[in-house]
Amino acid sequence: MKKTIIGVVIVAIVCWLGGSWVLAKQQPSQEKITIVGSTALQPLAEAVANDYRTKHPQTSIIVQGGGSGTGLSQVQAGAVNIGSADIFADQQDGINANKLDDNIVAVSGIVPIVNEELGIKNLTMKQLQQIFTGQITNWQEVGGPDLPITVINRAHGSGTRVAFEQTVLKPGMQAVNAQEQDSNGTVKEIIRNTPGAISYIAFAYLNDQVQSVSLDGVAPTADNITTNKWPLW
């Protein structure tokens, strides 16, 4: 069962825009499978689960979020069959990577987003860094309206946050104190309803409810992610 599911996932990523499935070793075959972890990978997990169910209707597959840290800790504890994460097992404190199998299945782009009424469509990487470290606190400083910047960060344990900070922040820099949320969907909803707000989400969650932000003139598109023109992934 384990090999079959992972095979389906690997085929699926040809059409998807890194993340990984992490499996506890020596899992027995079974008719019920639980996948928990990264909300960035949740749309992929749900799509694969739906496809698998059509071919194997006797199998129950439960897909839940919770964040990369939760996925790793739950699969290590044997509470779930598959943990999804957009960090490797050896990057998470408290996880014994030697007891888990890492399986790379996708590259997930990360997109800065703002409230669509703000009027900001492009930032430099330096400006993004200064916003998330609290050096820039008003949108007027980057060509926007005279409006305080409200930073919404991802929670500790989020693989998306780890990837974002590794790319945007320099060593030794600390993110500004801010409200933290543990799911892409919640972040998007807050940005949609909060003038002056900025955060970041996985590419799979991007839609016209929020304004995506280009970086140094490069737009967050599937083509730019796959050709490595887009810096956040």
Where in the sequence are the language-model features?
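Exported/periplasmic ABC-transporter solute-binding proteins
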Residues: 2-233
